[in-house]
């Protein structure tokens, strides 16, 4: 995985594992709400009443409903650090 994902993947994975409600703002201004079901290099699956596949290139901002603590680098060596796995 490229270095550009060193913050993005753990952040999205923490939001997914803790089922944190998020607001996702798209580049066109649309606001989507739900929880992150899964993600990969190109898309995020957002679950609310339905699941929506949102392309990352269309995302401007991800806003969690509550503060999120990112795992330290040593934490990822011990746990499930595989991106997107539910």
From Swiss-Prot:
Record flagged with keyword DNA-binding: no
Domain Sm: 9-68
Keywords, ordered alphabetically: RNA-binding, Stress response
InterPro entries with a match to the protein in the record: Hfq, LSM_dom_sf, Sm
Gene Ontology cellular component list: cytosol
Pfam families, per database record: Hfq (PF17209)
Skewed-composition ranges (Basic and acidic residues): 75-86
PROSITE patterns in the record: SM
GO MF annotation, one: RNA binding
Family: Belongs to the Hfq family.
Quaternary structure note: Homohexamer.
Protein name: RNA-binding protein Hfq
Originating species: Pseudomonas putida (strain W619)
Taxon lineage: Bacteria, Pseudomonadati, Pseudomonadota, Gammaproteobacteria, Pseudomonadales
């Amino acid at each position: 995985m490229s270095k550009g994902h060193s913050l993005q993947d753990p952040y999205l994975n923490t939001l997914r594992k803790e089922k944190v409600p998020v607001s996702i703002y798209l580049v066109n201004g649309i606001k989507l709400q739900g929880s992150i079901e899964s993600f990969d290099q190109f898309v995020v699956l957002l679950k609310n009443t339905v699941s929506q596949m949102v392309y990352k290139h269309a995302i401007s901002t991800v806003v969690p409903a509550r503060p999120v603590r990112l795992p330290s680098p040593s934490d990822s060596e011990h746990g499930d650090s595989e991106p997107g796995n539910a």
